[in-house]
Amino acid sequence: TLPPVTGGATLKSALHDIIDGHSAVSYTPGVWNALVVLDEDATNTANVLLIYGGDSRAKSLQDNGTNSANYWNREHLWPVSRGMNSDTGTLGGRDLHHIFASDKDVNARRANLPFDEVSGGSTDPEAPLSRYTSSAYEPRDADKGRIARA
């Protein structure tokens, strides 16, 4: 907990003491290992819950580079191509605050589209409450808060 402080250098020092000693995870396997814990389905601990669709998917169906359907992968809410350092070995590229388990096909459709309200557009087949156009992606309402806080 944060002790009572008046601000300035004292506050900065107190915050530093709280976060000092954190551990950075590797992109592979670190982020994968974290997602199976962070996005675990509380009703079926062998599965992860996927962002955008809310589906529960077996942890064992982690994308291994195949073209198989039903696999899940790592969705970066802030796309690497939109200003994140493209080196996933950097801290930004593996920041667990904005990486979630996602259906690999949904992730591919979202690509690097910005989040926005979408009227019309297409319904995502694997995430039917999410919609997209060629210029924007609107996640289902149940995920908007998570995304906003990421």
PLM features: what roles do these ranges have?
Residues 64-150:
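Domain-level detector of nuclease and nuclease-like folds
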Residues 58-62:
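Short, solvent-exposed loop/turn elements at domain surfaces
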Residues 1-57:
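N-terminal module-boundary/linker segments of secreted carbohydrate-active enzymes
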